[in-house]
Amino acid sequence: MAMNLRKNQAPLYIKVHEIDNTAIIVNDGGLPKGTVFSCGLVLEEDVPQGHKVALTDLNQGDEIVRYGEVIGFADETIKRGSWIREALVRMPAPPALDDLPLANRVPQPRPPLEGYTFEGYRNADGSAGTKNILGITTSVQCVVGVLDYAVKRIKEELLPKYPNVDDVVPLHHQYGCGVAINAPDAVIPIRTIQNLAKHPNFGGEVMVIGLGCEKLLPERIASENDDDILSLQDHRGFAAMIQSILEMAEERLIRLNSRTRVSCPVSDLVIGLQCGGSDAFSGVTANPAVGYAADLLVRAGATVLFSEVTEVRDAIHLLTPRAVSEEVGQSLIKEMKWYDSYLRRGDADRSANPSPGNKKGGLSNVVEKALGSVAKSGTSPISGVLGPGERAKQKGLLFAATPASDFVCGTLQLAAGMNLQVFTTGRGTPYGLAAAPVLKVSTRHSLSEHWADLIDINAGRIATGEASIEDVGWEIFRTILDVASGRKQTWADRWGLHNDLCLFNPAPVT
């Protein structure tokens, strides 16, 4: 494992668990038919990088095992050394939710990790920011054009006067009107908007731009102070609207500019974990390294969020035993059941996940993807569960229920109070968020070389034996502290690569 494959390209595969009957090819570009491994395995055909090879002969109907779990059944006879293509893998049924073990294997607490801090912005509510941003919230999509024009003016004319303010970020969304505002599920987008407006990186400064006739009243977002609300219909013409927005913004910029970074305990961090453009290496390099870093963060008192219901659902039987109590375990199951029902309403098929890119990277189905995805959660006890759009109010490892969409998940983690996100990718994505730093970790060395000015940390070294999971986990942990302190900038922030917010609205649009 310690060999440098980038120089001599010695053939190598990775078998995760001792009972696995499949392994993935490590070598860049894959390996040709006839390749002989040190164990005597001979490839019966060309196998692409990251794709699975059979370690034993498999008869039709036999279990295909990876991560020590059944990821499918052989649809036909597969000879030892053959490429296990997606078409040869019949997906198993998802775990039944009514008889899962609850809180029966709760990990023992580990010694506290002391002596680590970061330089953050202290807020009046006790939270801390990793950035110092003026966030401007909208109550309805109708005002976006006016706000965008105003933000351009703010950045050009006002922001240079206030060097301690990092940015001005408009919080756009598609909600606010033409929606069933009182439908039961409307609570999800509404509380998401409410919590986004009070994000820790906005320093307690709330500013809401509304139209004046929308269903989502601005008062529901900024309920504490009418001075935080500006209604366009109260103004005589466009110029007056812009002038009022600029004046309202400058009042807040003055206050934000007076803020300075102070030493904060790691317990003030709320770290979101997410993966996008996953591949077969995600579950053996980047995600386990992030999981190791997550354990370090939990030991240091931080809040860590892992998410993506559809990429947890097929591994839920591995999570409910880690719940700190039966109540937390039941909350996990409740979120799975709600999402199962939501998908049935849309007649959605589990086979819709993974994506074509995931499959090209070696993932056969959502079961295999889920088993790799949950590695991000590390090994800590699961101390709580958040519904979509809820704000985190406790420390430790939390499951924040979100869809798997990068953009929806990122938005909901921001609403939970996330002040920095760690994002793993195998295929590569330029994804970023304006409201919080996004630290990107590659699953493969070749991606980190190909996108050297987009990837922050290379976890592909784990696959080649040049670094251990622990090594990269500590690197991620220390980089989180550097980015949170403003000592280091992520590539996404350096280039200004910021995706739009995307609300999760399961309620009807009228």
From Swiss-Prot:
Write out the entry's keywords from A to Z: Iron, Lyase, Metal-binding
What is the superkingdom listed in this entry's lineage?
Bacteria
Metabolic or biological pathway, per its Swiss-Prot or TrEMBL entry: Carbohydrate acid metabolism; galactarate degradation; D-glycerate from galactarate: step 1/3
**Leading EC class:** lyase
- Co-factor(s): Fe(2+)
Any matching Pfam family: GD_AH_C
Role this protein plays:
Catalyzes the dehydration of galactarate to form 5-dehydro-4-deoxy-D-glucarate (5-KDG).
Q: Which PANTHER family match?
A: ALTRONATE/GALACTARATE DEHYDRATASE, GALACTARATE DEHYDRATASE (L-THREO-FORMING)
* UniProt family annotation: Belongs to the UxaA family.
Could you tell me what this protein is called? Probable galactarate dehydratase (L-threo-forming)
